[in-house]
Amino acid sequence: MAEKEIQYAKSFREQFTLRGVLIGSLGSLIITMSSMYVALKASSLPWPIIFVALVSMFSLKLMGKTNINEINVAHTIMSAGAMVAGGIAFTVPGIWMLKLDTGGDLKFQISLLVIALSGVILGLIFTALFRKFFIETQELPFPMGQAAAETLILGDRGGKKAAILFGAMGFSALWAVVRDWFHKIPAFFTGGVTIPGVTFGIYMSPMLMAIGYIIGPLFLFVWFIGALIGDIGIVWGGTTAGLWTLAAAAGIKSSLGIGVMVGTGFGIIVKGILPKAKTVFGSMFSKSQRGDAIVPLRWAPIVMVVLAFVFTSVLHMGVVSSIITILGVWLTTLMSAQILGQTGINPMEVFGVIVLLACKAATAIGQLEAFFVAAIVAVACGLVGDVMNDFKVGHMVRSDPKAQWFGEAIGGVIGAIVSIIVLFILFNAYGAEAFGDPTVFPAAQAGVVASMVEGIANMPAFLIGLCAGIVFYLLKLPVMTLGLGIYLPFYLSFTAFLGGLLKVIVDLIQKGIHKNKPETEIRKSGVGLIIASGLLGGEAIAGVVIALIMVCLGLGAI
């Protein structure tokens, strides 16, 4: 099977096209609908990037001559709305769980639309500011983005490697369908081991193993150390030694993990952003200074002031909380991009909780308004995290970041509007009591936000984590993944760690086979990354397809 040359765009106009925008917009509408429903129904959200990359590629190829950059921009538009929906679904239903608002009046619906659009606008600003730092300066792996880029490159080029990629993709998709739709494969393998308070075992997910393989051993090793500290040390060790109860251990574990992640966020600002403030933020204050920004941003400070006014007057969040929210989005979008770039995971509702708690500590903000804060932050973090994957693809295929950013704006606005419409369609069909009901819409993440409205479970653990996160980051340790490992369930960290361990073994075998070849040639000769990209993509695609089927069946039953 012969390989073809990749077709690249020769200009901005060949990347940002009318047909690409139309295809991307239609895809964004569909993906946002499915993402909202599945986030509520299954308390999870499959990454759509590889699915939409393939849909964009096949759709544009059917319409005639295209190029890989036009495809990249189209799938950026498509995927942008998905995590906007996730940000809303992972926070807002908590309002109804705590019976804070009936949701039936127009004023509340407009408030939620303002929240979604505000999160998108802030996400766009911080994407434009931070894209170069994470994609080019830090060169984070962004495993989902790498897998999508491999899919586009090999899909466009064809040949033997494309056959390997799509073969792995088909296997992974079939595995996911048999596991999640037909329930013939167990979701977990525990080996009969049970540890009180610890979700021990291996998650039977080719995608998670592939994420571990793509990330590589360094980040995975630190991630797994975090899991050992949180689950084996604090939960199992602490309770076995009689130091605290299981409930207290869970509070210490989550507080410590969040503290480490927040501390790392401050470390990024102190060490990575502030020393380059003129370069990073120059476009916001100088007409002649573009800096690292994708587009000129002299309008951004004015927009932030307007948003603060809207938060105060329309959402009644108060002046101080409004300012904290905007500053909090700055911090948490940095954290979101860092975590996602290192692990492929984006706990957007956690970032919402962090800023929510900061507002509660500084002001007497009400519970309803606290949810508004969490939703704005979660939407912004969801959007920034998601499109950083798309920008990773763009960097690998040499797309114009400006074309992608305009695509992000279109997809994000569509996602904000559609997600609120779908949320209230479901609200009117099922009622407020359906949210939090395990048989209808469990919305587990929103339940977590609702439980955290009262405050941090263990403040000493949070402060220890905060200080540790700052210090370790300044010492150049990849400590963000440590905090994530402490916070997440053990099975997620362990499964990803096995993927990283497999990468070490494969690399050692390849070095033994190709002893006299340089490192770059050894990497090119191997197919491990191609197979991992296929495994990751197949399960992600199956997840989106199952989500679309669930939407059709679920909405058809209304």
Residue ranges and their predicted role:
Residues M1-I558:
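Alpha-helical multipass membrane-protein architecture
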